[in-house]
Amino acid sequence: MTDVQIPSPIVATRVAEADRLRFLPTYFGPSMLRMLRGEALVFGWMGRLCAAYHGGFWHFYTLSNGGFYMAPEHDGRLRIEVDGNGFAGELSADAAGIVATLFALNQLCAELAGTADADALIDRYHHLAAFASEHAEAAAIYRAID
């Protein structure tokens, strides 16, 4: 008999208020400049992707596979438009945050290309992409980042 192992779903956990200060250095690295750059890229990508976004509070999430993402606190859906691939659609704030975080990680990896720091961020990109493939809005997320 063959034992078939079914992979466990990747679980997202919202970071508690008391743990928020450790989030950015844990996932973007200990450099203050990189932490600020990473956070600013996520916010910036959301601003480029969503005309209705004008800042606000963000939730931080850790993933059981070692990844992470950030998502704006917002009730309802957000209109996301990606000029580079023609995607236009409405996503939950959670899915929109995943898209913005993936774009930000991609850009930060390109900026740090050829360094060990880039390798860690590339892994985090792939961890988040794996989670996105299990998300309820996976099809829309992947169309947005295509």
From Swiss-Prot:
Keyword Iron-sulfur: no
Record has NADP as a keyword: no
Gene3D superfamilies for the chain: Antirestriction protein
Pfam families, per the entry: Antirestrict
Keyword line: Plasmid
UniProt-listed InterPro entries: Antirestrict, Antirestriction_sf
Induction pattern: Expression is decreased in the presence of KorA and KorC.
Entry coiled-coil feature ranges: none
Free-text function comment from the UniProt entry: Could be involved in overcoming restriction barriers during establishment after conjugative transfer.
Family per record: Belongs to the antirestriction protein family.
Protein name as annotated: Antirestriction protein KlcA
Organism: Escherichia coli
